Amino acid sequence: AVKNMAEIAEFTERKIHYIQRFKTADFKIKNKLDAISHSTCSMAIDLDAKAIVVNSLSGRTARMVSRFRCPIDILGTTTSQKVWRKLNLSWGVKPVLCEEFSSLEVMLYNSLKEAKRMFNLQKGDNVVLTGGQINGKSGNTNLIKVEEI
């Protein structure tokens, strides 16, 4: 029964046109995180990005990006095993447990390296990164960056 349900779900998801759904949906942007998450998905679609990388202590940013059902692969990095387990349940998110990094640049570099490995990214592929400053506190998402491999 579970196998049949999985096959039906996979068949149905292949038939959904996620880009059209995203562009025609009327999302209510209520706060800064909504705006950043929506903009991340929008940029990824507009730039034909091959991946979205979300760095998140609490997992909230990754879940917010996931809720827009963006058709782009999402890599969710976190330092918490508890958050990593929860991100496994978020639509389209491939969670990765990582170490704490000393600077934003090091964190972005390592996240991008992991995305290259995980999604087999090639030279010329675009990746949209989002997250916040490294200060040990969650809830500080304030960054969107586009990188070309």
Residue spans for each PLM region:
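Long, charged amphipathic helices and adjacent flexible linkers at domain junctions
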Residues: 4-41
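Structural signal for hydrophobic packing residues in well-ordered secondary-structure cores
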Residues: 6-16, 44, 69, 91, ...
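Flexible, glycine/charged-enriched surface loops at secondary-structure junctions
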Residues: 14-25, 50, 55, 121-125
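Conserved mixed alpha/beta catalytic, RNA-binding, or beta-rich assembly cores of soluble enzyme
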Residues: 37, 50-53, 58-63, 67-73
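Structural motif
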Residues: 50-53, 72-75, 93-96, 125-128, ...
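Nucleotide-binding motor/catalytic cores of P-loop/tubulin-like NTPases across gene-expression machines
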Residues: 61-63, 69-106
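Beta-strand/loop-dominated core regions that host nucleotide or nucleotide-derived cofactor-binding catalytic loops
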Residues: 94-98, 109, 113-114, 141-148
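C-terminal binding/interaction regions
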Residues: 108, 119-130, 134, 141-147
